Amino acid sequence: MKKAICSFIYYKLLGWKTKVSAPDYDKYIICAAPHTTNWDLFIGKLFMGAIGRETGFMMKKDWFFWPLGPIFRWMGGIPVDRSRKTSLVDQMIKIAKSSQKFHLAITPEGTRKANPNWKKGFYYIAQGAGLPIILAVSYTHLRAHETTLHL
């Protein structure tokens, strides 16, 4: 039912076209770019629902206030405190290794502003946990493309 609803909204109502070439692994990192708007989260979640996959995401902790916090957590959100220099990469590696399923979407720019210098956390998480990276590129005339990169 969820897949049908997400498919209807994503493909029919919003008019997106997709090309999915990545197998459905039990564990992976999605590197999604470019991140240009707050709508990216919802479009990405609709896309994943439409193809029958689930994924978590990391988001600035400032967004996890009432009533959005419980909703974002329910959607798979992980709050990130960017002001503290904690080893988020090490934490994500530990979670990935101890989980039977681990699907995490990361926007490598780290912000919605144009940033040609991507943050490398997604790569280090994938490398440390031995996960494939799925590259997801969007926003070319309502088209999304996905492919897999093995490290």
Regions found by a protein language model. Give the residues of each.
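Extreme N-terminal tail/first-helix region
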Residues: M1-K19
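Catalytic core of membrane glycerolipid acyltransferases/transacylases, capturing the structured
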Residues: Y11, S21-S83, V137
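Conserved Motif II region of HX4D acyltransferases
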Residues: K27-A32, D90-A129, I133, R143
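Glycine-rich, highly charged phosphate/nucleotide-binding loops
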Residues: D81-Q91
